[in-house]
């Protein structure tokens, strides 16, 4: 009997000892003998993903999303290549960017990273280049500049509606939360492009409609999901239980229900013969293209595609417009020069002008380029997998095949060797002659580069040109207590500002 009572304790001790020895040996190997041990970095990074989680989730109360900035500081001390995981290297060298993300790059997307987004059946998450090309077949003509130009009247309706809301709030003596307003504007534009019908986010009294709020709250939760993938298992629990455990599960469920409702509504409208006057994302997704290998996705695939397009088109464009407008109205010299240029094609605040005319304005173009650089709305790193054969860096160090390697758009846009005084909003840097501007433009990468770059680039540019031009020409924004400190941000997948950009939106008289 005594032997039986002691035996379980002995087994537990043996198991615990084996576990401890295994992890001790693994730690020694990872830190000192792994092929990636030649790269400097925190020893904690070599041991697991939780070093990154510390900086993105819990570095200190009230301040998260600091990994991006910690990497910047470490690169300046330790060099252009850092170890940031058991199987990951982060690169800071701008010259490597166009190798990693060029067209035809052999560095494929890491499936595990992009499935964190919660839309595993989307084109964005597809890592296989052949399947990715097939998935893009219906999307490329839809996002072409020619097709996007046909959307101009629809986009103009939303800009006018946004202006009306600004007038209403000014008449009530209420300041506008510009970030929420501009995200609502972007949401209405991209949702009508996706479904043929706007979500009418601009109608919300505070610009905080459910879809805008859900995306605002869901994206920061991806840091938690990346660090603790088992959180997704909560989706299998009844919602009333899961949402008590994790707010991100509730937000994810809201997103799925939102997309499913929109698909059902679109199908019902199409069955009733109600079709939009312009091509929509849903319409194109429902047309097979057998010669290009594209088959119509199932409902989950449609849902995932719609969620990624709307998410990418709402937050990022809204953030870029928010940062750009703040810096215009916070800098009198930039403001006055831009307004004077706009008056050459828009003689009165009520003037309408074509997108192509706006696109031809050099200072407006410089302001928008600088806004995209300065805001870096998709700032985080985008990891790829090192191809077979590995890669040798210019300094001779070797990265084995299968290693995750990535760079961050923010680190390119704020690199002092590429952009002098990068923390200064300076549109003049884009007006220093064609050769200098062309060289700098190689490293303006808000939409990434290569075959995996953002499909929505033409739509985003049109939205920015129209929003910036018409708001600046129509309104004299009076900042209400907003400072540059408020516009600093944490990397919560997309920038999350420390404060709020509030402004009284007074109509110009001339």
Curated annotation (Swiss-Prot):
Highest taxon listed in the record's lineage: Eukaryota
TM segment ranges: 7-29
Annotated protein name in UniProt: Cytochrome P450 monooxygenase macH
Cofactor(s) the protein requires to work: heme
PROSITE patterns with a match to the protein in the record: CYTOCHROME_P450 (PS00086)
InterPro entries according to UniProt: Cyt_P450, Cyt_P450_CS, Cyt_P450_E_grp-I, Cyt_P450_sf, Cytochrome_P450_monoxygenase
Keyword annotations: Heme, Iron, Membrane, Metal-binding, Monooxygenase, Oxidoreductase, Transmembrane, Transmembrane helix
Family that this chain belongs to: Belongs to the cytochrome P450 family.
Annotated GO MF terms: heme binding; iron ion binding; monooxygenase activity; oxidoreductase activity, acting on paired donors, with incorporation or reduction of molecular oxygen
This protein's encoding gene: macH
Pathway terms, separated by semicolons: Secondary metabolite biosynthesis; terpenoid biosynthesis
Signal sequence extent: none
Subcellular location: Membrane
Positions bound to heme: 454
UniProt topology in membrane: Single-pass membrane protein
Additional remark text: The macrophorins cluster contains a single gene insertion (encoding for the terpene cyclase macJ) compared with the yanuthone cluster that produces the linear compound yanuthone.
Known role: Cytochrome P450 monooxygenase; part of the gene cluster that mediates the biosynthesis of macrophorins, isoprenoid epoxycyclohexenones containing cyclized drimane moieties. The first step of the pathway is the synthesis of 6-methylsalicylic acid (6-MSA) by the polyketide synthase macA. 6-MSA is then converted to m-cresol by the decarboxylase macB. The cytochrome P450 monooxygenase macC then catalyzes the oxidation of m-cresol to toluquinol.
EC number in record: 1.-.-.-
GO cellular component: membrane
Top EC group: oxidoreductase
SUPFAM superfamilies reported for this sequence: Cytochrome P450
One Gene Ontology term from the biological process aspect of the record: mycotoxin biosynthetic process
Pfam families to which the protein is assigned, alphabetical: p450
């Amino acid at each position: 009997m005594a032997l039986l009572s002691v035996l379980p304790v002995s087994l537990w001790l043996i198991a615990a000892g084996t576990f401890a020895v295994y992890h001790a040996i693994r730690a020694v190997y990872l830190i000192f003998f792994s092929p990636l041990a030649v790269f400097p970095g925190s020893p904690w990074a070599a041991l697991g993903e939780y070093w990154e989680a510390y900086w993105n989730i819990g570095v200190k109360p009230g301040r998260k999303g600091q990994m991006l900035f910690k990497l910047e500081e470490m690169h300046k001390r330790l060099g252009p290549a850092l170890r940031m995981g058991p199987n990951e290297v982060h690169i800071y060298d701008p010259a490597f960017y166009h190798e990693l993300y060029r067209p035809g790059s052999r560095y494929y997307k890491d499936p595990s990273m992009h499935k964190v987004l919660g839309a595993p059946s989307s084109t964005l998450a597809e890592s296989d280049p052949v399947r990715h090309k097939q998935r893009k077949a219906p999307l490329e003509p839809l996002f072409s500049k020619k097709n996007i130009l046909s959307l101009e009247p629809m986009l103009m309706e939303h800009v006018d509606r946004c202006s009306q809301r600004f007038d209403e709030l000014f008449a009530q003596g209420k300041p506008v939360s510009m970030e929420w307003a501009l995200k609502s504007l972007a949401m209405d534009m991209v949702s009508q492009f996706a479904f043929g019908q706007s979500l009418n986010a601009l109608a919300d009294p505070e610009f905080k409609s459910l879809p805008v709020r859900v995306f605002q709250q869901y994206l920061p939760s991806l840091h938690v999901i990346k660090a603790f993938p088992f959180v997704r298992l909560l989706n299998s629990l009844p919602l009333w239980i899961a949402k008590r455990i994790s707010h991100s599960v509730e937000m994810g469920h809201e997103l799925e229900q939102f997309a499913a409702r929109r698909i059902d509504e679109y199908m019902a409208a199409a069955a009733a013969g109600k079709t939009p006057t312009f091509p929509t994302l849903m319409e194109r997704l429902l047309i097979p293209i057998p010669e290009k290998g594209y088959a119509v996705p199932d409902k989950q695939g449609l849902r995932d595609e719609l969620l990624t397009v709307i998410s990418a088109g709402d937050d990022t464009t809204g953030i870029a417009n928010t940062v750009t407008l703040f810096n215009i109205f916070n800098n009198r010299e930039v403001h006055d020069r831009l307004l004077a240029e706009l008056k050459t094609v828009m003689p009165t605040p009520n003037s309408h002008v074509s997108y192509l005319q706006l696109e031809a304005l050099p200072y407006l173009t410089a302001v928008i380029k600088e806004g995209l650089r300065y805001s870096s709305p998709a700032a985080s790193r985008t990891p790829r997998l090192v191809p077979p054969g590995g890669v040798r860096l210019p300094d001779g160090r070797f990265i084995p095949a299968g290693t995750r390697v990535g760079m961050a758009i923010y680190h390119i846009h704020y690199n002092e060797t590429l952009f002098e005084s990068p923390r200064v909003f300076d549109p003049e840097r884009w007006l220093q002659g064609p050769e200098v501007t062309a060289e700098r433009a190689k490293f303006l990468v808000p939409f990434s580069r290569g075959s995996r770059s953002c499909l929505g680039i033409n739509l985003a540019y049109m939205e920015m040109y129209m929003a910036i031009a018409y708001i600046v020409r129509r309104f004299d924004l009076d900042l209400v207590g907003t400072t540059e400190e408020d516009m600093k941000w944490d990397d919560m997948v997309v920038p999350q500002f420390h404060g709020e950009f509030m402004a009284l939106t007074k109509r110009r008289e001339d």
